[in-house]
Amino acid sequence: MNSPIDPAIVMPDVQSSTDTRHIPIQRVGIRGVRHPMLVLAGDGAAQPTVANWTLTVALPAEEKGTHMSRFVALLEKYRATPMTPALFAAMAREMLPLLHAERGDITASFPYFINKSAPVSGVQSLLDYEMQWIARAVGEQVEFELVAQVPVTSLCPCSKAISEYGAHNQRSHVTVSAIVDGDFRMDELIRLVEDEASCELWGLLKRPDEKYVTERAYDNPKFVEDLVRDVAARLKAHPGIGRFRVEAENFESIHNHSAYAVVEG
């Protein structure tokens, strides 16, 4: 049985004591935290999801420990607030004085869903995308990075050119990491990637839709090299995007390995 706490007794705060080893810690905090998150979707609605969170701060050499419970308290504060890139950045900025830190990072990884209409029949279904938001705060300055993994179809130009009929095609993952401004929307980045693939994906297709996607991919063949270059060209031309990295992996249907390419800009 727990003994009662005497309010007259001051409990020791060990983590606030001085550390004598004089070794600063670049990142300390919590990771692997599954916590609800509301994301402001492209249609303006608040989409509920569950994110995997990592929150860390830098710890000066003279401090023994950080305030671990305050990370979770910060998550709880924003649990019911629809999150935007700008608000996510503000959350990272708020974390620093709360933890008495000069710099810190917040990362949230979560599934995001878009309701899509099939290209011919118009039947609607959800498609999921793996997203990651990263905010890096130094004082009042915050850098926001958006990471999106977009599944698409790719069709091989060489296979089409040498075959009398048909061409091998496969599902591909295009992962874009980009420094974006606070007004940037996830849907815009996803749409940009899908536009540059041989064809986009849908959760539900009828026979007329299957005919469309088969012929669409055949008319728009792309190597993995074409895919990353075309996406990179679009990112370079976008005024709301800074540094970026485009990674494409084609899960080859005629090999037991993937084709892979990366462009950084």
Curated annotation (Swiss-Prot):
The keyword Hydrolase applies. Keywords: Hydrolase. GO terms for molecular function: GTP cyclohydrolase I activity. It is an enzyme of class 3 (hydrolase). Pathway: Cofactor biosynthesis; 7,8-dihydroneopterin triphosphate biosynthesis; 7,8-dihydroneopterin triphosphate from GTP: step 1/1. Its EC number is 3.5.4.16. GO terms for biological process: tetrahydrofolate biosynthetic process. The record marks 156 as: May be catalytically important. InterPro entries: GTP_cyclohydrolase_FolE2 (IPR022838), GTP_cyclohydrolase_FolE2/MptA (IPR003801). It comes from the Bacteria. It catalyses: GTP + H2O = 7,8-dihydroneopterin 3'-triphosphate + formate + H(+). Belongs to the GTP cyclohydrolase IV family. Converts GTP to 7,8-dihydroneopterin triphosphate. This is GTP cyclohydrolase FolE2.
